[in-house]
Amino acid sequence: TSAEDGAIFGAMGGGSMRYKTGSYADVKGYNLAMGFGKAVANNAGRLTFGPFIEYGKGEYTSHLDGGIRGDGNTKYYGVGVLARQDNNSGVYYEGSLRYGRMDSDYASGDLINFADNRVQTSYDSSSAYYGAHLGIGKVTELNDTTKADVYAKLLYTHQNGDSVTLQGEGNGEVYDFDAVDSTRARVGARVSKAYSERGTGYVGLAYEYEFDGEARATVLGFSTPSPSIQGSSGLLELGYILQPKGVNDPTINIGLQGWGGKKQGVTGNVNFVWKF
């Protein structure tokens, strides 16, 4: 093996999404990630690996079938490591591990008390999360300027449970939230075409299935209605990659994604890789 260049990479994203959970939740937010990567050549191709930090912030409104509306804010911050092997044949493998903390708050004026009256109540919650992903794909050159990338990914996230005490007119009731596990499988394809030495456009389609994603809670030992995002979603993406003009310039990827199914909405991202 022989050492190659290092790189600093970053990603910024944001959007507005609706999650259909038996009822539904609307979420608006943004996320940031930045890390350092090192590339090492090997007999099969090239291995890239490195650490990263991540941060995200959002606001949400949830609507339950019983007419209960709640509003809140959430943020997360964590660290992770990632690795990707790109083989000379076009086949690649990738994976990542993440760990961090998520803080959230919730407020509603629609909860029903024992006297059957709507009351104003709120709570704050904080818990750890961890996650991992594995992926495999193959990049095939269709002609001199066009490539196809067919891939499959498995993504897992676990958020620890928490016990929260209702504030306001919630009368100090304790909600015990179970841990939440999300396991998603995604298969997709992306076709990219180089329009010049510096510019490449791409379009992609993907199918995603959430196997779990159920959020359970108990109050006074009784289970409450459990929202779940189990089910299918579809993704359509468009983007443009701008290659560096000079030796010290970054590669910039600008993308737009549209979702339908269990997840509905629009997101966008700007990613960069600065090699040195």
Predicted regions and their residues:
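Outer membrane beta-barrel translocator domains of Type V secretion systems
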Residues: 1-143, 147, 253-271
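Solvent-exposed, glycine/polar-rich loop segments of beta-barrel outer-membrane systems
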Residues: 23-24, 63-71, 103-126, 160-181, ...
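Predominantly extracellular/luminal carbohydrate-interaction, adhesion, and secreted-enzyme modules
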Residues: 53-54, 156, 188-190
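Outer membrane beta-barrel transmembrane domains
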Residues: 80, 142, 167, 171-276
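Solvent-exposed flexible segments
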Residues: 138, 148, 153-161
